[in-house]
């Protein structure tokens, strides 16, 4: 349950938390609607435009926070695995489902994915705050002063923006190098020391980052 439906809840709460921190009210709807998307609603265009014009980093984070939330949750589960605080039999199903769910979002960037949702089909307060998280982030990073709209499709990106999207999609494949996905064994460095190396990729308000980690388990601690 937590791996499939739970990720939708925590992902959308990641988006909403940015608004909550800024004192902006919103409504999380973490259940799939008629367009098969979960969303955060209850925010006017005027509020979002003002956020873009006065607090651009947080406006971009509004797009990335869902995937950042997925990343933070999975990093915590990596910690539990790496330091033997949980075994694969307990939370692996949750971990694997969440990993694939977030990775699927990144892999949509490798194809000409169309978000067939028109803003005018919903009332303003019923619209998702950002639409496609990554397309919206990319468009606003490259063209922060262009006409405001929420739902960004692949064909609305410039050639350079499309290249940037594909770059993110390819770089996200680093996430498959995490040995916990494959239930890999730790590396024996000495009689009392085990290591778990990993590489992770995620979005951030400035674009993206790649993180290298080495977890050391010494005397089983």
Regions found by a protein language model. Give the residues of each.
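Hydrophobic alpha-helical membrane segments
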Residues: 1-221
């Amino acid at each position: 349950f937590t791996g499939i439906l739970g990720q939708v809840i925590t992902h959308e709460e990641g988006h909403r938390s940015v608004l909550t921190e800024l004192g902006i009210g919103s409504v999380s709807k973490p259940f799939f609607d008629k367009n098969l998307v979960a969303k955060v609603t209850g925010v006017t265009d005027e509020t979002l435009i003002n956020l873009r014009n006065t607090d651009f980093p947080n406006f971009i984070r509004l797009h990335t926070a869902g995937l950042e939330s997925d990343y933070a949750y999975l990093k915590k589960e990596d910690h539990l695995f790496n330091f033997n605080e949980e075994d694969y039999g307990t939370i692996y199903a949750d971990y694997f489902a969440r990993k694939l769910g977030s990775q699927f979002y990144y892999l949509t960037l490798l194809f000409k994915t169309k978000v067939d949702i028109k803003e005018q089909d919903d009332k303003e307060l019923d619209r998702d705050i950002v639409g496609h998280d990554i397309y919206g982030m990319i468009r606003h990073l490259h063209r922060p002063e262009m006409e405001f709209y929420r739902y960004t499709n692949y064909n609305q990106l410039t050639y350079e923006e499309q290249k940037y999207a594909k770059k993110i999609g390819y770089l996200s494949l680093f996430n498959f190098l995490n040995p916990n996905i494959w239930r890999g064994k730790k590396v024996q460095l000495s009689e009392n020391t085990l290591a778990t190396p990993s590489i992770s990729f995620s979005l951030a308000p400035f674009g993206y980052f790649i993180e290298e980690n080495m977890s050391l388990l010494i005397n089983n601690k």
